[in-house]
Amino acid sequence: MPLITNVIARQILDSRGNPTVEVDVLTETSYGRAAVPSGASTGVHEAVELRDGDSGVYLGKSVMKAVMNVNTHINDRLKGMDVTEQVEIDNTLIALDGTANKSNLGANAILGVSLACAKAAAEYSGLSLFRYIGGTLATTLPVPMMNVLNGGAHADNNVDFQEFMIMPIGFTTYSDALRCGVEVFHALKALLKKKGLSTAVGDEGGFAPNLGSNEEAIELVIEAVGKAGYSVGSPTDRGGIGDAQVMIALDPASSEYYDADRKKYVFKKSSGKELDASEMAEYWEKWCSDYPIISIEDAMAEDDWEGWKLLSDKIGSRVQLVGDDLFVTNTRRLADGIDKKVGNSILIKVNQIGTLTETLQAIDLAKRNGYTSVISHRSGETEDTTIAQIAVATGAGQIKTGSLSRSDRMAKYNELLRIEEELGAEAYYPGVKAFRV
């Protein structure tokens, strides 16, 4: 029986130079390490990331309280437990914290421990993490959402919407799909240079030029796909995917420009336009008729259930509508959405909920109710590649892990290449079959 002998946490730095938590879990015969990501645009319903708040140390962002919680309370409680009992470990962590949002010990402390335990258990079992979690049928590589153009909270420019992404859906292998993404990324860089626009990148490695409008952003991405020699689909109400190799995905992160008091969506970075929920839903309906969009994440604000319902009724049958801030990887909020027939997909961020068990429960609930799952990074990342392993373990079929630059993003793409190699002939890339619209 692989009993936990020590749980050790330390403060490290993430891809934005901010402190985060890294945890080592040791047993008598195995070891696991996990580092915790952090978001820039965070939902109000997310589990709480515990930071010290001392403005004189790392501008208040130090995580030494969370580190100490791991090294004392959590270490004392988990010592002697069987590291392969993931559910028991996670339930113990939840009970030890004693709050609904993990604000006592910190979700960053709890998550680091939860993931490190899974890795130690996988090593003890002599298996890759994706095999340990997912079993012998874990053979599906995810279709990536590649964030090539940034705006919103992820970039200092005049684009309201946070992420403009490409999805290489017309391929039969992950490695070919990845190559497509890389070539489109470089074609976009050349296109921006030719137009005299900045090729500086945002938090997730996508370009962040100052553009005249939100429309110009998506049109540049579509143009870059063609310049790279790939075909882009049609709008989903006019033929849609067909034999296209690439479709477009968006993450507007609408909660960031939603005025909850006035119930208005305010395009404050670009035109200053103000739209109510009905007008915002119509806006997205028009975009999905004008552009080859297959997926929109957080198209409406996190608590604008009325707006979400309007949009779901309008385009939910032909466009993947992903709830991130809406569902926050939380089974209770997802169950509400399912009951209200809102959205048709959930974004899975391990640090939104705080344990591996709860993450897997959210994916399972989505799957049982016909919702897709997209495994996701955060804007503040590390070299940790756990989400790549989770994507394959769960057969989610989709992953969102940034652009084709910055080593913190490339680490996940490269890990998927290694998994594809390990799987060999068993590796399956679903392409368009990853979607249910």
Swiss-Prot record:
Signal peptide: none
Swiss-Prot/TrEMBL catalytic activity: (2R)-2-phosphoglycerate = phosphoenolpyruvate + H2O
Main location: cytoplasm
Cofactor note: Binds a second Mg(2+) ion via substrate during catalysis.
EC number(s) reported in the record: 4.2.1.11
Cofactor(s) the protein requires to work: Mg(2+)
Subcellular localization: Cytoplasm; Secreted; Cell surface
Similarity comment text for this entry: Belongs to the enolase family.
Stated name of the protein: Enolase
Organism placement in taxonomy: Bacteria, Pseudomonadati, Chlorobiota, Chlorobiia, Chlorobiales
Gene giving rise to this polypeptide: eno
